[in-house]
């Protein structure tokens, strides 16, 4: 007898999660965006949704939901994607998805400690993505003024961190409360 390798491909569940996740992300980003007063910068509830999807399905689904959802929003809203921010949202989903194994939401438990640590991670991820990746992308790709894009990045970092801390945390807690806790007992 030989050992069979577990299929490491993209599962049907992941494909469906990506499609539904990106569609909901697009709708939230398009229709529930609150202006901040800084041009092209909004309080975005879609980032809280991305936290749930990435926490449930991992980094690849998080990456794709961020990329696809943001691309759709920009294409519909502005006529073309703003690639530096599309890429940044994808990277944000990827980074959030790295928390999947740690959060272990499928086991129906989410401690306060895990939730606090997740929020520290999402805050660090927000800083990396919106203070570094997005502004540098704007400068390199679009030749935007540094002062403008770093202001946009700083504001986005703050509002997205708050959005994920509130909306993302509430979604994670609600999901876990809706799941039965898995015990360590196994039926034979």
Swiss-Prot record:
Keywords: Cell membrane, Membrane, Transmembrane, Transmembrane helix. The chain crosses the membrane at residues 15-35, 48-68, 79-99, 121-141, 154-174. Its main location: membrane. InterPro entries: ECF_substrate-spec-like, UPF0397. It is found in: Cell membrane. It holds the Pfam family ECF-ribofla_trS. It is a multi-pass membrane protein. The keyword Membrane applies. GO terms for cellular component: plasma membrane. Belongs to the UPF0397 family. This is UPF0397 protein LCK_00164.
């Amino acid at each position: 007898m030989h050992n069979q390798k577990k299929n490491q491909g993209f599962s049907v569940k992941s494909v469906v999660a990506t499609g539904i996740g990106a569609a909901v992300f697009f709708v939230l980003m398009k229709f529930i965006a609150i202006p901040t007063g800084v041009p092209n910068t909004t309080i975005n509830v879609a980032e809280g949704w991305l936290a749930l999807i990435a926490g449930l399905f991992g980094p690849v689904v998080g990456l794709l939901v961020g990329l696809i959802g943001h691309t759709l929003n920009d294409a519909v809203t502005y006529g073309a994607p703003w690639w530096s921010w599309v890429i940044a949202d994808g990277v944000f989903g990827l980074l959030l998805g790295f928390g999947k194994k740690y959060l272990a939401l499928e086991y129906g438990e989410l401690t306060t400690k895990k939730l606090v640590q997740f929020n520290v991670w999402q805050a660090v991820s927000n800083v990396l993505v919106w203070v570094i990746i997005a502004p540098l992308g704007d400068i390199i790709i679009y030749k935007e003024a540094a002062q403008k894009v770093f202001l946009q990045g700083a504001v986005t970092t703050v509002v997205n961190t708050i959005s994920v801390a509130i909306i993302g945390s509430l979604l994670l807690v609600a999901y876990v409360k809706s799941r039965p806790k898995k015990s360590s007992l196994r039926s034979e």
